[in-house]
Amino acid sequence: MKLPLKYENKRKGLEFISEKTRYKILLTLLASENPLSFSRLKLILSSIPENSLNYHIKILKENDFIKNEKRTEYKRSEPRSFYSLSQRSIDLLESLGLTEVKEEFQALFEQMT
């Protein structure tokens, strides 16, 4: 039996974000009030090696789970690239009920930062 397309897409999304590092990145972005730079993500998710974090961010971007905003006006010492959730991620996390507990994630996020 073939699943209807909307359920197949959801299944693929669930499979994709079930990878632990990607899940942590998405929940961190969900908890953040603002987009986060790579250096900020690296600081918050310090248990994840930098090359692994970079790899999973790349995969999340390529599959439209996160957005990458590049700022054109910046000081040399400031980050230029910031990450936030895409609508695809928001929809998936919402369907899982995770956006309903955003305040809890934000409280955890505040403790981590």
List the predicted regions and their residue ranges:
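A short, conserved structural fragment
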Residues: 61-72
